[in-house]
A protein has these predicted regions:
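Stable alpha-helical structural segments in soluble proteins, enriched in small hydrophobic residues
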Residues: 37, 41-50, 76, 80, ...
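Residue-level detector of conserved, well-ordered beta-strand and adjacent loop positions
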Residues: 8, 22, 78, 91, ...
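Active-site-proximal gating segment of KS-fold condensing enzymes and close homologs
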Residues: 69-83
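Acyl-CoA/ACP chain-elongation machinery
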Residues: 23-35, 60-71, 87-136
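Short acidic capping loops at alpha-helix termini that bridge into adjacent secondary structure
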Residues: 53-55, 85-87
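Conserved beta-strand-centric core segments of catalytic alpha/beta enzyme folds
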Residues: 1-13, 102-169
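Local beta-strand N-terminus motif with an aromatic residue
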Residues: 55-56, 147
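Condensing-enzyme catalytic core mediating Claisen C-C bond formation in acyl metabolism
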Residues: 1-51, 57-58
Length: 169
């Protein structure tokens, strides 16, 4: 269980914000193919943000710890980022919190935004060694990185995939 909410204000708000919602994408999976819509959702978010693939500086992965879903997510991200995927710091919060189901993407976003604010790529709790089938750049330790753009992706039961690009204010 979990919950999270955001107050989204206009860009010209007098109060300082954590980040800009720069771009968004959403796609559905093809019948029976897990995470098949994730590539399109992430690609759409980057395009919608007006960014290039190379502008993605950090990834907050769905990373549920399920071998099939983790591999499918990683394959989608490999298809999008190619060989540069190993150079993009990534993390997942599922090892710390488990899955909060519908609240998980909002909680992921909060973690990603706090990391961006504090110039950190958060650690992936309970992660210890690289899976040969997954080329995400995960770490068991927090890493310092002053990053301006973070991609947060999610995959829901029933095949809904979403991705958001947040950019530092």
């Amino acid at each position: 269980e979990g919950a999270c909410f955001f107050i989204i204000e206009p860009e010209d708000s007098p109060r300082p914000g954590y980040a800009l919602v720069q771009g968004y994408g959403s796609r559905s999976d093809r019948d029976g193919v897990v995470c098949s819509g994730l590539y399109g959702a992430c690609s759409d978010a980057i395009i919608n943000a007006g960014l290039k693939i190379t502008d993605t500086e950090c990834i907050c992965a769905w990373g549920p710890g399920h071998r099939l879903v983790d591999k499918a997510e990683c394959d989608s991200l490999k298809m999008l980022f190619g060989r540069s995927l190993v150079n993009i710091p990534a993390f997942s919060i599922k090892g710390a919190l488990g899955s909060s189901l519908g609240a998980a993407p909002a909680i992921q976003s909060a973690a990603a935004l706090l990391g961006m604010r504090d110039s950190l790529v958060l650690r992936t709790v309970n992660w210890s060694s690289r899976d040969p089938d997954c080329s995400l750049s995960l770490s068991a330790d927090n890493r310092r990185l002053d990053h301006g753009n973070v991609l947060v992706n999610a995959h829901g039961i029933g095949g809904v995939n979403s991705a958001v690009i947040y950019s530092k204010c």
